């Protein structure tokens, strides 16, 4: 999970700032929770 957080912090935030014109890192939306759901077939 740390890898994904580092990628978001280092690369995605910079791209969002340039694309939407944010002036501060605090204006960029944050990822708060990621939920995965996987079915296992017949119960």
UniProtKB/Swiss-Prot annotation:
Keywords: Ribonucleoprotein, Ribosomal protein, RNA-binding, rRNA-binding, tRNA-binding. One of its GO terms (cellular component) is ribosome. Disulfide bonds: none annotated. The keyword Transport does not apply. InterPro entries: Ribosomal_uL5_dom_sf. One of its GO terms (molecular function) is rRNA binding. The keyword RNA-binding applies. Part of the 50S ribosomal subunit; part of the 5S rRNA/L5/L18/L25 subcomplex. Contacts the 5S rRNA and the P site tRNA. Forms a bridge to the 30S subunit in the 70S ribosome. This is one of the proteins that bind and probably mediate the attachment of the 5S RNA into the large ribosomal subunit, where it forms part of the central protuberance. In the 70S ribosome it contacts protein S13 of the 30S subunit (bridge B1b), connecting the 2 subunits; this bridge is implicated in subunit movement. Contacts the P site tRNA; the 5S rRNA and some of its associated proteins might help stabilize positioning of ribosome-bound tRNAs. Belongs to the universal ribosomal protein uL5 family. This is Large ribosomal subunit protein uL5. It comes from Proteus vulgaris. The gene is rplE.
């Amino acid at each position: 999970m740390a890898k994904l957080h580092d990628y978001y912090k280092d690369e995605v935030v910079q791209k969002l700032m340039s694309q939407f014109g944010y002036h501060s890192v605090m204006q960029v939306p944050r990822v708060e929770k990621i939920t995965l759901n996987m079915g296992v077939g017949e119960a």
